[in-house]
């Protein structure tokens, strides 16, 4: 059978292996000695899977064709796995119809993967990648607010006010809620990891949109700078983590028997003006804008990773290291001058 790996090795399935987070997660799992099954929509798409084929040199990696809309396509990749990491999610920021382009497929994808997990008797734990967008969006006022795993994004506000790109936070919130409902009803050991905006470098051939967004103040991309401002206005802060720490957190909560529930993964909380000031000082060679007029200079909230840290996790990267690596990555990609 295609799914058989050497006996005695822990086996993990990573759903959506071509993505920014998933591909690095595959790499770290292989480096830890796991046998890995990963799913992709089209294994014949060389551009999308070439970095995964290169990772096969690191260890026992099998690539499967699977589609989030097809429940049965996950049976083979999940069979025999100890852990299942569901990282894939549909993203169409410019969608005219978020309900059908993002929200319904995200919920359906989560349920389809979890149904396959219930049939595979080997699965000990399912780890779902959620998003800070499922936690932070609310109509709370004031500054100095702290949000943690108890908080959920206000879906009624999103679906009635429909702020720009509302479909993404709505899809992440509703997909995570659907996962918890299914896990409870079917006795699945589920953990969700809730990352903030991620930066660093990527194994994928395309530059991930989140690194582009994080780097916008340095590249001067006005459209993306407005995206950062929109993020601060909608979610209350600009919060960031290194993609490697996010992947390490996924593996940490999978392996930690006492882990349960939701875990926010956030290394630093800031605002657009504060971040611009920091970047302008650290990288004076780039023309980082620092005048934002009457735009709110401070974030209204802090996204807390206290629960993850108390569990025993330590972050490798602070905001300095996150941006140093992102700058080097953009230089290597020819997107920044030296």
UniProtKB/Swiss-Prot annotation:
Family listed: Belongs to the NAD(P)-dependent epimerase/dehydratase family. Dihydroflavonol-4-reductase subfamily.
Organism: Vitis vinifera
One biological process term in Gene Ontology: flavonoid biosynthetic process
Domain of life of the organism encoding this protein: Eukaryota
Record flagged with keyword Oxidoreductase: yes
UniProt entry tagged with the keyword NADP: yes
PANTHER family xref list: ANTHOCYANIDIN REDUCTASE, NAD DEPENDENT EPIMERASE/DEHYDRATASE
Additional remark text: Hyperbolic binding of NADPH and NADP(+) to the free enzyme, with a single binding site each. The most likely enzymatic mechanism is sequential ordered Bi-Uni-Uni-Bi, with NADPH binding first and NADP(+) released last. This enzyme is strictly pro-S stereospecific and the reaction mechanism involves two hydride transfers from two distinct NADPH molecules.
EC number per UniProt: 1.3.1.112
Protein name (record): Anthocyanidin reductase ((2S)-flavan-3-ol-forming)
Pfam family, one: Epimerase
């Amino acid at each position: 059978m295609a799914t058989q790996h050497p006996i005695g090795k822990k086996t993990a399935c990573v759903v959506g292996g071509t993505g920014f987070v998933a591909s690095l997660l595959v790499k770290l799992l292989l480096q830890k000695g796991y046998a890995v099954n990963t799913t992709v929509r089209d294994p014949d798409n060389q551009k999308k899977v070439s970095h995964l084929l290169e990772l096969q040199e690191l260890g026992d990696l099998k690539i499967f064709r699977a589609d989030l809309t097809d429940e049965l396509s996950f049976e083979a990749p999940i069979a025999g796995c100890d852990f299942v990491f569901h990282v894939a999610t549909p993203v169409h920021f410019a969608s005219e119809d978020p309900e059908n382009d993002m929200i319904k497929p995200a919920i359906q994808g989560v349920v389809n993967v979890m149904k396959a997990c219930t049939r595979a008797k080997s699965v000990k734990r399912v780890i779902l990648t959620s998003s800070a967008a499922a936690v932070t969006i609310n109509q709370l006022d004031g500054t100095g607010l702290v949000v943690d795993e108890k908080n959920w994004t206000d879906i009624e506000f999103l679906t009635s006010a429909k702020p720009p790109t509302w479909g993404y936070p709505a899809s992440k919130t509703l997909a995570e809620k659907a996962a918890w409902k299914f896990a409870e009803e079917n006795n699945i050991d589920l953990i969700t990891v809730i990352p903030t905006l991620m930066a660093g470098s990527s194994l994928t051939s395309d530059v991930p949109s989140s690194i582009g967004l994080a780097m916008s103040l340095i590249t001067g991309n006005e459209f993306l700078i407005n995206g950062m401002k929109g993020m601060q206005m909608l979610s209350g802060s600009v919060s960031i983590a290194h993609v490697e720490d996010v992947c390490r957190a996924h593996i940490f909560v999978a392996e930690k028997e006492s882990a349960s529930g939701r875990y926010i993964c956030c290394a630093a909380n800031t605002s657009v003006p504060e971040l611009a000031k920091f970047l302008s000082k650290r990288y004076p060679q780039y023309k980082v804008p620092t005048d934002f007029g009457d735009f709110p200079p401070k974030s209204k909230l802090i996204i807390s990773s206290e629960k993850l840290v108390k569990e025993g996790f330590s972050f490798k990267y602070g905001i300095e290291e996150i941006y140093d690596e992102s700058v080097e990555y953009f230089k290597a990609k020819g997107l920044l001058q030296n």
